[in-house]
């Protein structure tokens, strides 16, 4: 019995030895294959292909990266993106292979963008070429990567929701994997996406969908309209880009403005301009004033209805007249004080002194 056990043990030891020997023989081959998969041997070639801080859209997007612009509808994300990319084409940084994949537009809109494309050197692709956008994008990326053409191309994806269900975490992750495959081969992607209807506590847009697109991109901005104003040339919209994520020397924020003309897209396109220097401070100050006025709107409208620009009214008379509106006395007094300042600071009425040193107010001219 002992001899049989000893014999079995010897057989087990021999089997273990053979298995170990096989592992020793197999492992070096596999490790060599694994080493061959690494980028170490290609680093010099990759360095030659690397794009050193080449700006593709103003100073908001870098070549070789995935950049996402989030904005609500009618903010101007397509307009501004096309303008900035066209400037990069003109100065030679974007190359000759910029493709606007426009899946979120009307027939007339496609014609307008195609006219711009012909004038400014980019290429317009519409829904007829992307019947199944997710599959078509994957096929396009695979073809460009396999032909070593990705590094020569810029893709403007308009909009992300046409390529993927942004509420589907797995689908969003797969979409970003496709985008990463493209940029890992040297390509550049600028993707336009939407924000939720509900804003955050700072009144800023919240990227729509799961976090995967924001998590997996290189750079992202949330755009929001600061204000619309009427000037000698018509209505102008001012838009701010606020950075949510960055890899590389892109700006943390930027402000652009454009002339709103729904009858002439090319005129709107040509009007887009960057706001710089002192004008940035003025825009930010005005935006802060507008935000405060929006908070005080009910009280401002009530007080304004009681005042005129000729005869001042005492604070006591104003409060008595507005006493039945349901606005608290403290809110009205604070509003009277807050907006009795110079017009350049947002002032709405003038404070003067009446009998017995009483506070009197009249509308500013």
Indicate where each model-derived feature is located.
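Structured loop/turn residues at beta-strand edges in well-structured enzyme cores
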Residues: 64, 96, 150-151, 184-185, ...
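Generic beta-sheet signal
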Residues: 67-69, 98, 153-157, 189, ...
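Conserved inter-motif catalytic segment of the P-loop NTP-binding fold
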Residues: 57, 93-173
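Helical mechanochemical/support elements of P-loop NTPase systems and associated helical scaffolds
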Residues: 106, 110, 136, 171-178, ...
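The Walker A/P-loop phosphate-binding site
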Residues: 23-117
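Conserved, well-folded catalytic cores of nucleic-acid-processing
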Residues: 87-91, 117, 163, 182, ...
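C-terminal regions of RecA-like/P-loop NTPase motor modules
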Residues: 2-35, 148-151, 229-365
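Phosphate-binding/switch region of NTP-binding enzymes
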Residues: 68-70, 74, 79, 173-268
């Amino acid at each position: 019995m002992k001899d049989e056990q000893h014999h079995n043990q010897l057989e087990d030891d021999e089997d273990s030895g053979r298995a170990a020997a096989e592992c020793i023989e197999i492992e070096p081959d596999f490790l060599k294959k694994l080493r061959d998969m690494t980028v170490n041997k290609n680093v010099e070639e990759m360095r030659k292909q690397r794009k050193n801080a080449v700006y593709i859209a103003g100073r908001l997007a870098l070549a070789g990266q995935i950049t996402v612009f989030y904005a609500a509808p009618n903010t101007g994300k397509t307009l501004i993106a096309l303008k900035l990319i066209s400037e990069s084409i003109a100065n030679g940084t974007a190359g000759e292979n910029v493709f606007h994949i426009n899946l979120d537009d009307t027939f007339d809109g496609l014609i307008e963008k195609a006219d711009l494309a012909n004038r400014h050197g980019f290429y317009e692709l519409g829904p007829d070429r992307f019947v199944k956008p997710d599959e078509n994008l994957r096929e396009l990326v695979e073809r460009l990567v396999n032909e070593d053409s990705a590094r020569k191309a810029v893709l403007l994806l308009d909009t992300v929701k046409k390529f993927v269900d942004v509420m589907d975490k797995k689908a969003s992750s797969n979409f970003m994997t496709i985008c990463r495959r493209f940029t890992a081969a040297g390509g550049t992607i600028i993707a336009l996406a939407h924000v939720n209807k509900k804003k955050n506590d700072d009144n800023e847009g919240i990227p729509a969908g799961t976090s995967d697109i924001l998590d997996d991109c290189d750079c992202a901005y949330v755009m929001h309209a600061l204000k619309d104003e009427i000037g000698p040339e018509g209505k102008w919209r001012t838009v701010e880009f606020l950075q949510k994520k960055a890899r590389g020397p892109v700006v943390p924020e930027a402000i652009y403005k454009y002339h709103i003309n729904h009858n002439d897209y090319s005129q709107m396109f040509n009007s887009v301009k960057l706001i710089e220097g002192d004008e940035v401070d003025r825009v930010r100050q005005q935006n802060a004033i507008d935000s405060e006025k929006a908070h005080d709107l009910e009280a401002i409208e009530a007080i304004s209805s009681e005042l005129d620009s000729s005869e001042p009214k005492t604070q006591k008379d104003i409060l008595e007249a507005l006493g039945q509106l349901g606005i608290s006395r403290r809110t009205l007094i604070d509003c009277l004080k807050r907006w009795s300042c110079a017009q350049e600071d947002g002032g709405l009425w003038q404070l003067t002194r009446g009998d017995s040193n009483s506070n009197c107010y009249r509308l500013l001219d």
